[in-house]
Amino acid sequence: MTTLEMQNLSNLEKELTEVEEKTFRLISFITLYKQYDDLPRKERRLVLKQHKFAYKYYATLKKRIKLIKSR
């Protein structure tokens, strides 16, 4: 791997850990601070959208890191 690819990989890994933290914070917010069932309908939709986006982004970053490492 070139130095540019290594730098890109380290940046992606750093971003991945940040996304992991945000996702787990969101999940813990839902489960610990507010019960999901107690939320109004609009807030439930918003929480679900945020969770889906965070998970998709996390999965995409993992795939990109795996692809770069396999080169």
Task: Annotate the PLM regions.
Residues 2-71:
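Extended, charge-rich alpha-helical interface modules
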